[in-house]
Amino acid sequence: ALSNERPIYVIRYQGFNWYNAPMIVNYAAKSKEFWNTPCPVFVRGIGMEGGIGPVAGSSHHSLYFRMPGVKIASPMTPLEYKKVYKNFMREKEVYYVSEHRGSFGYKIELKNDIKGNKDLVIIAISITRFEAIKAKKNLEKKGFKIGIIHVLWIKPLKISKTAMNCITNSKYGGIILDDDYVDGIANNLANKISHITNKRIFTMGLKNKSAGFHKKVDNLPPTSDKIEKKIISIIKN
């Protein structure tokens, strides 16, 4: 990266960021600021969960979120990935790209639904975007008006003014879904969006516990059923 190359650094399981992140955030991300020497690295953090224990699983993009000099994106479709890579090639920044194995089989692009007045708006990150779509469809069958915003750019956060207005005009605000612990990106973005829209923003993500190797002790991102129940409880309470 220091010799005008653009390396791609692959972290096979995002949980391994606890070991890999220090050299990225403490050198590559600071090189441009300290020495005016860009160190553009494309970091592929690949998420997965389910029977892989307390170290490897889930998405851990929050580890990079508070550190300066890093941009974070979470593409879940082919065109989104191309967009992120093209941006990286135009800039001289460190990119942390939060991927997920669960998205690799999807070829259909994901679109926001922000037209009209909604009861509540789902703001979905990473692999939760697919379960969010299922929950949205189920809730609409029950008569609820549910919007959805698919978050590609996490840092800096990029949500259009039109999408923000959809949250502002909704009855009950929004809910952020993430494949990470909520005491990180989810709560941070909830606070930020709440200030902009003057609406309550709820969060859902991983439970505050370590995952085991058996399905009974796993720690998985919110399912469509759990999302649906949470949204109904928000609307009715």
Language model feature labels by segment:
Residues A1-E131, I146, K192, I235:
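Conserved thiamine diphosphate
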